Amino acid sequence: MTTAPSPPPAVTSARILRLWWPLAASWLLMGAELLLFTVFVARMPDPEVNLAAYGSIVFPISLVIEAPIIMFLAMSTALVADGDAYAKLHRMMLKAGVLLTVVHVLVAFTPLYDLVAGRVLKVPVEVMEPARIGLRIMTPWTFAIAYRRFHQGILIRFEESRAVVVGTAVRLVANVAVLSVGFAVGGIAGIVVGTCAVATAVVVEAVYVGWRVQPVLRERVRPAPVHGAPLTRSAFLSFYVPLAMTPLMMLVIQPIGAGAMSRMPNALASLAAWPAVHGFVFILRSVGMAFNEVVVTLIGEPGAVRALRRFCFAATAVVTGLILLVAFTPLSAFWFGTVSGLAPELASVACTALLFAVLMPGYTFLQSWYQGALVHSRRTRAVTEAVAIYGVVAVSLLTLGARWQAHTGIYFAITTFTIGGILQTAWLWWRSRGPMRALGPDSDSVPAAEVAWNGTSPAE
């Protein structure tokens, strides 16, 4: 005699918090990695050039190359419900990781680098060679990210999110270990020590996550019956291609922003201060980014919409209050001058730049709320539309700023990103109204991955 499976527990604020906090902690630790880079490299020889090399070339180019696989986490969270889906998507992950690693090698080890960094981005000449070395060291980054995010999504889907934060803690320990050894040895360029730490840490985390997910695959994924129609290539592409275009378009703006700052007044200071400012803002934005997977996982369950909305708005108020507290008090000078170790002139630039970023953490939570509803409802094209709006606005304003030559680059760039982000959030809200109405405040819809696949997206 078989018994019906017990229904999932009600979606309450406590359940949302239990799923969200490990993911938020994981994102916070990733943000700490960016700050650690700044803290250590700022205390090594020639910090301004090495920080600029990482902030203007190494980090943004590495992100652009890996952009097509960034959404593997959301993909596996939504789609890996059984062994058949896992096998097909695992093969896709391996192929994408290898292909993008080849792209990274071509950019870092061939004359393509001179074209991208010198002719396209026009970064200061003193930054070119340190950044070339750093980009080469980052070669393992892309495949490790693909492997890690794919398996993290499976852990999140099956509510094993604490394993995700443990993996990120392992990554942070590896990062600190390499940075500490490099700093203690001395005489090694900051860009070399920093990128060795970042590359080593992400590989170590990928190995841990791959080991930790094995019991979930063995006991819960592979034995599970196929949900709905089998996952087909056309169904997958209709779901994932718009989703993958989202970070690609978003991250292409990063090197464009670096290129624009290189053409604006106070270029080297802007590029050198950028990693510290971006790292701090990323910490507060990261907890909002973690909310996206929570929404995708829970929004189809009864009562989820009301509970998730309430949680989102409360969290938005908290993170906005925190960044306002830092930006408009002496805490910003303490952070950038004492903690980050920036020289006084760079710390001053960073403190002023933070004032232009105060809306970013709040609208990141809102973006995750609206975007999660769209991903659950398979309306991923709307997510791409929102990012396209962001991209058009950002590129247009950055081009104007580079020609205008009236403001310090980092101030103009952050203002541009904020304006684009607000418009992106507004579009996500507009396009998510239909899915939100369909789900309703007390939705009894089935989880997203149980929707039958027919090779097409829902009506837009």
Enumerate the predicted regions with their spans:
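Short alpha-helical transmembrane segments in multi-pass integral membrane proteins
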Residues: 2-23, 77-141, 181-241, 299-359, ...
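Transmembrane helix-bundle signature of multi-pass secondary active exporters and lipid flippases
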Residues: 24-74, 241-297, 322-323, 357-364
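Hydrophobic/aromatic residues within transmembrane alpha-helices of membrane transport systems
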Residues: 25, 37-41, 54, 76, ...
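Hydrophobic/aromatic residues in alpha-helical transmembrane segments
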Residues: 37, 72-76, 113, 151, ...
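Alpha-helical transmembrane segments and their helix-entry boundary regions
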Residues: 51-52, 89, 152-153, 161-165, ...
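Small-residue-rich hydrophobic transmembrane alpha-helices
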Residues: 53-104, 148-152, 156, 273-323, ...
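Residue-level recognition of pore/gate-forming positions within transmembrane alpha-helices
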Residues: 59, 171-175, 198-206, 279-282, ...
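Alpha-helical transmembrane segments of multi-pass membrane transporters/permeases
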Residues: 154-180, 192, 301-316, 373-399
